[in-house]
Design a protein with these regions (language model features):
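Acidic, proline/glycine-rich short linear motifs
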Residues: 37-62, 92
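Structural beta-alpha unit
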Residues: 71-105
Length: 139
């Protein structure tokens, strides 16, 4: 059913839930999981310098922790950290899903950057509209 699952992660509780949902889908279907973490960057107006709120090590550590959750359950997992420009995360997630030929995209309903009161985070909302693949949004 789901041979290839892409799960988008950040440092949020919803992200942890998404990893667990991807794990459960993979265990049920015998699929493998790709864990994608995007580091959003902004261009500085004066200097053109990139500003990123987390270190490469922090991002890599989170991906490694997510991959560990999956492999402990017997799921084959791959992890990747990519940089993207602020506001382009949804496109990157969809493009990565195409690249790995994912059968489904799994992600949290809100990430750490979304306003807590929103029912559906802006990135999840955009992914749903941009993707031609099923999207499982975890709450």
């Amino acid at each position: 059913m789901y041979d290839r699952i892409l799960v988008a992660v950040d440092h949020s509780e919803m992200s942890d839930r998404a990893v667990r949902a991807a794990r459960d889908l993979a265990v049920l279907s015998g699929g493998e999981v790709w864990v994608l973490h995007l580091r959003e960057r902004e261009m500085g107006a004066k200097t053109g310098v990139l500003r990123i709120d987390e270190t490469t090590q922090e991002a890599s550590d989170q991906v490694a922790a997510s991959v560990n959750v999956l492999t402990e359950a017997g799921v084959k997992a791959h992890g990747e950290v990519r940089n993207t420009i602020f506001g382009y995360a949804a496109r990157e997630i969809v493009n990565d899903a195409i690249e790995v030929d994912a059968d489904v995209i799994v992600m949290g309903s809100r990430g750490r950057g979304d306003i807590a009161g929103l029912l559906l985070g802006s990135t999840a909302h955009k992914v749903i509209h941009l993707s031609d693949r099923p999207v499982l949004v975890v709450r």
